[in-house]
């Protein structure tokens, strides 16, 4: 067997490093804390709807965490499902 026709070995490909996990915090507040009603109210509209990402400025992952937290607080009775209808 001759070594002239031997194919060169491929170098081992490195797997790209994973992105760091997003910490669901807003300053000193944890977005997963469903008992912190004052912080969660900042992300609700006047009628009680969850504000969209473009208004809150959160990442997609943080917005999903926030939505789960608000829904959990609503089920436990800490936040209302709806507010009074605001008429202008």
Curated annotation (Swiss-Prot):
The keyword RNA-binding applies. Gene3D superfamilies: Ribosomal protein S18. GO terms for biological process: translation. The keyword Manganese does not apply. Keywords: Ribonucleoprotein, Ribosomal protein, RNA-binding, rRNA-binding. InterPro entries: Ribosomal_bS18, Ribosomal_bS18_CS, Ribosomal_bS18_sf. Located on the back of the platform of the 30S subunit where it stabilizes the close packing of several RNA helices of the 16S rRNA. Forms part of the Shine-Dalgarno cleft in the 70S ribosome, where it probably interacts with the Shine-Dalgarno helix. Part of the 30S ribosomal subunit. Forms a tight heterodimer with protein bS6, also interacts with protein uS11. Binds to the C-terminus of IF3 and to the central section of Era. This is Small ribosomal subunit protein bS18. It comes from Thermus thermophilus (strain ATCC 27634 / DSM 579 / HB8).
